[in-house]
Regions:
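ALDH superfamily catalytic-core signature
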Residues: 1-121, 149, 177, 222, ...
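Conserved C-terminal structural/oligomerization subdomain of aldehyde/semialdehyde dehydrogenase
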Residues: 4, 15, 47-48, 53, ...
């Protein structure tokens, strides 16, 4: 708290939770932070999420629209209940969305929901359950080694981000995360000036796997050409 890295971290987590209403493969599901930051982080992140205007995306004042369908909203609510086996909700009411515009009864609106798990080393749901929506769980660590261990319990992901201005800490954590994540981003006061953020695809790198958009190479610059070529 009180550092540029802390502010960048809070802003990036809130953005990655709410862009596309959290319905994207690189959305932040687990927030691993120093235990001494618990109170300040939950307060700052909860306040930022609470200011998110929800409603009809055609409304210029709205910053987050609905989920893909009413069924998807019920699925996310069910996953929140699963997560609640290990964690408690500290911000956001999943059952009573606060919307700026649109029809609350017909639209699949959902408030951003932040949970807190005090003992993530002994928990399973917070590492195994993915709520494909604006939902994330804060979990504390006491050492860099513990932070890496908690990250690894997610069994791999497309991207992990480390926010720190300490080169030694960054080196230790990045080396521990690299085998389990497709990309590792380092965020600090210097890189923030040019960083495209946690979830942005980068030129020359594949982004994602085989899906409706392609094989992950369509955003890879010149590598994208190979997507349309026969190769043996």
């Amino acid at each position: 708290p009180g550092t540029e890295e802390f502010d960048l971290f809070v802003r990036e987590v809130a953005r990655e939770m709410t862009v596309k209403a959290g319905q994207k493969c690189t959305a932040i599901r687990r927030v691993i932070a120093p235990r001494s930051y618990n109170e300040a982080l939950i307060e700052s992140l909860g306040a930022r999420l609470g200011k998110t205007t929800i409603g009809n995306p055609a409304d210029e004042a709205v910053r987050m629209g609905p989920l893909a369908s009413l069924d998807q909203r019920e699925e996310v609510r069910a996953r929140i209940r699963d997560l609640s086996a290990d964690a408690e909700i500290v911000a956001g009411d999943p059952d009573n969305p606060s919307i700026q515009s649109g029809d609350a009864s017909a639209g699949a609106f959902l408030n951003p929901v932040l949970l807190y798990c005090d003992r993530p080393g002994a928990a399973r749901a917070v590492h195994d359950v993915e709520a494909f929506g604006p939902v994330s769980t804060v979990m504390p660590y006491d050492t860099a080694e513990e932070a890496v261990d908690l990250a690894r319990r997610g069994k791999g992901s497309l991207v992990a981000s480390v926010f720190t201005n300490d080169p030694g800490f960054a080196e230790e954590v990045v080396l521990g995360l690299a085998p389990f994540h497709g990309r590792v981003m380092i965020g600090n006061r210097t890189s923030a000036k040019s960083s495209t953020g946690h979830g942005s695809p980068l030129p020359g790198l594949v982004h994602g796997g085989p899906g409706r958009a392609g094989g992950g190479e369509e955003l890879g610059g010149m590598r994208g050409v190979k997507h349309y070529m026969q190769r043996t």
